[in-house]
Structure formats: structure tokens, C-alpha cells
């Protein structure tokens, strides 16, 4: 058999090997972990976004209303009203600037998008590996497809906060069967495909 035919057979192979299923399981578990952590980060930043946004809304509404009604104040009070409106406007501006500097709103949306995307990847991987091997897509196609998705999500997702990492490690420290991401202070040794000398000689 020619080398070209052998390569075509490898690409057309439909059956799954145990090590390929192990790779899919690792990605599925890690995707589930990332979904959980990004969801917790979203909850934290959603609260932060609320605490930064509501005061600005209240101050802006109050200053706008007061500014509109300036003529109703006595001449003695107008100077104080102007100073008060100016001070509140400065405070609102400072709060908005701090929020923008800390990227509260952007991170809030980023964590939301990441949580949804990681959950979708986990669902796809879980569905794939739960099916009968003969009903799945080819292993080479699946690994190429989901490797690209996993790496892309890892690159574009916002960083997990230390607080959420600590929460995750505390909550799931006894989940020995769950394969966790490396960011959770867990380094796994690199696996090598095991073959006997006879199997290597027959390759």
C-alpha cells in the first residue's frame, strides 16, 4: 500500500480510540470549570456595575432637575444651588471615569459572553462523547474542530479573578474525577500514549 493510501485511510478512520475520548473528556471538564468560574465573575462584576451606575443615574437626574428649576430659587440660594450642581456633576464624572478605568462594564459583558461560550462548548463536547462511537463525527475532525474552539475561547476570555479561583478550589477540592484547568493551581503531568515494543515495531 502506498504512503498516500495510508494517509487517506488515517483521515477516513471513523472509529474512536480511547486516548481520543480522553482528550474530549478533558476539554469537556475544563470547559465546564471555565463556565462556572466565568459565571461567578459575571455575578461579581454585575454587582460592581450596578453600584457604579445607579449613583450616576441618581446624581444626573437630581442635577438635571435642580438645574431646570434654578429660577424658582431665591437669589440668596442660587449661588449655593450652582455650587451644589457643579459639585454633584464632578462627583458623577469621577465615578464614571473610575468605572471606565476599571473597565467594569466591559468586563461584565465579557464574562457574560465567556460563560455562555464555555457552556456551549461543554454541551457540544458532552453530547459528542455521550453518543455511541459509530454515531459521532470522525475523531480527527472532532479533535481539530474542538481544539480550535477551545484555544480561541481561552485566548479571548477575560482573566479569572483570584477570588473566584479560590472559590472554585474550595468548592470542588474533593471532586477528584473532575479534570480542572491549570489556572486552578493544579498541574497535570503530560500523558504519553503507551505502546508495547511489539506494537511499535509493527507500525
Where are these regions (language model features)?
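Generic structural motif recognizing short loop/turn segments at the entrances and edges of beta-strands
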Residues: 20, 64, 77-79
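Single-pass alpha-helical transmembrane signal-anchor segments
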Residues: 60-64, 87-98
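Conserved non-transmembrane functional hotspots
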Residues: 2-58, 69, 81, 95-203
Amino acid at each position: 500500500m502506498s504512503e498516500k493510501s495510508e494517509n487517506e485511510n488515517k483521515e477516513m478512520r471513523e472509529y474512536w480510540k480511547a486516548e481520543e475520548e480522553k482528550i474530549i473528556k478533558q476539554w469537556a471538564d475544563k470547559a465546564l470549570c471555565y463556565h462556572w468560574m466565568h459565571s461567578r465573575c459575571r455575578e461579581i462584576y454585575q454587582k460592581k456595575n450596578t453600584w457604579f451606575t445607579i449613583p450616576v443615574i441618581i446624581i444626573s437626574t437630581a442635577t438635571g432637575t435642580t438645574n431646570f428649576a434654578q429660577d424658582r430659587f431665591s437669589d440668596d440660594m442660587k449661588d449655593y444651588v450652582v455650587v451644589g450642581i457643579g459639585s454633584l456633576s464632578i462627583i458623577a464624572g469621577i465615578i464614571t471615569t473610575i468605572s471606565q478605568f476599571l473597565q467594569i462594564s466591559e468586563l461584565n459583558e465579557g464574562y457574560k459572553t465567556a460563560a455562555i461560550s464555555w457552556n456551549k462548548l461543554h454541551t457540544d463536547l458532552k453530547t459528542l462523547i455521550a453518543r455511541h462511537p459509530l454515531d459521532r463525527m470522525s475523531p480527527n475532525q472532532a479533535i481539530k474542530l474542538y481544539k480550535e474552539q477551545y484555544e480561541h475561547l481561552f485566548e479571548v476570555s477575560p482573566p479569572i479573578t483570584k477570588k473566584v479561583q479560590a472559590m472554585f478550589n474550595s468548592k470542588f477540592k474533593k471532586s477528584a474525577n473532575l479534570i480542572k484547568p491549570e489556572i486552578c493551581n493544579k498541574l497535570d503531568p503530560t500523558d504519553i500514549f503507551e505502546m508495547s515494543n511489539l506494537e511499535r515495531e509493527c507500525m
